[in-house]
Swiss-Prot record:
It comes from Streptomyces anulatus. Belongs to the cyclophilin-type PPIase family. Keywords: Cytoplasm, Isomerase, Rotamase. Its EC number is 5.2.1.8. One of its GO terms (biological process) is protein folding. This is Peptidyl-prolyl cis-trans isomerase A. It comes from the Bacteria.
Length: 165
C-alpha cells in the first residue's frame, strides 16, 4: 500500500476535517488508480464538490456520484463502468474503502466506507483501500452519526476538496 488520498469534508458548509485513505494499489492497481485520479480531478472530473448521498448508521457511508448526486450517476476514468479487478481483499475490518456497484463488473466512481464488519459483501464489492488513521476514522464516525436506516442524512456532507498526498 503506497498511495495516500484525502477528502476535506464540510458538514452543512462548515469545515469538519480531513479523511485520509491508504490505497491498496499493490493488490488492486486499476481500482486504486481510478479512485486516486478522481480524487485529484486530473481528468477534468472527480470527487471535489460531491457529497455523501447515502449514510446508513451501523453500516457504511456512500459517496462518489459526482454527476447526479443521488446514487444513480458517476463514471470511472476508464469510461462509464469497469470490471471487478479481483476480490482478494476481504471486508474483514471497519474503515475499509470498497467500490459500490449495481452488480457484477459495474464499477464507476461510487465507493463506500464501512463502519462495521461486512463479510456478506466479500466477492461482490472490490475492497481497494482503508481509512488511514484514528483522526480520519473519528470523522467517519461523526458522519455516520448523521445517517439513518434509510440512508438519508440529517446534514449535507460534502467532499469540499480532495487529492493525493
Amino acid at each position: 500500500m503506497t498511495t495516500k488520498v484525502y477528502f476535506d469534508i464540510t458538514i452543512d458548509d462548515a469545515p469538519a476535517g480531513r479523511i485520509t485513505f491508504n490505497l491498496f494499489d499493490d493488490v488492486v492497481p486499476k481500482t486504486a488508480e481510478n479512485f486516486r485520479a478522481l480524487a485529484t480531478g486530473e481528468k477534468g472530473f472527480g470527487y471535489a464538490g460531491s457529497s455523501f448521498h447515502r449514510v446508513i448508521t451501523d453500516f457504511m457511508l456512500q459517496g462518489g456520484d459526482f454527476t447526479r448526486g443521488d446514487g444513480t450517476g458517476g463514471k470511472s476514468i476508464y469510461g462509464e463502468k469497469f470490471a471487478d479487478e479481483n476480490f482478494q481483499l476481504k471486508h474483514d475490518r471497519v474503515g475499509l474503502l470498497s467500490m459500490a456497484n449495481a452488480g457484477k463488473n459495474t464499477n464507476g466512481s461510487q465507493f463506500f466506507i464501512t463502519t462495521v464488519l461486512t463479510p456478506w459483501l466479500d466477492g461482490k464489492h472490490v475492497v481497494f483501500g482503508e481509512v488511514a488513521d484514528d483522526d480520519s476514522m473519528a470523522l467517519v464516525r461523526k458522519i455516520e452519526a448523521l445517517g439513518s436506516s434509510s440512508g438519508r442524512t440529517s446534514a449535507k456532507v460534502t467532499i469540499a476538496e480532495s487529492g493525493a498526498l
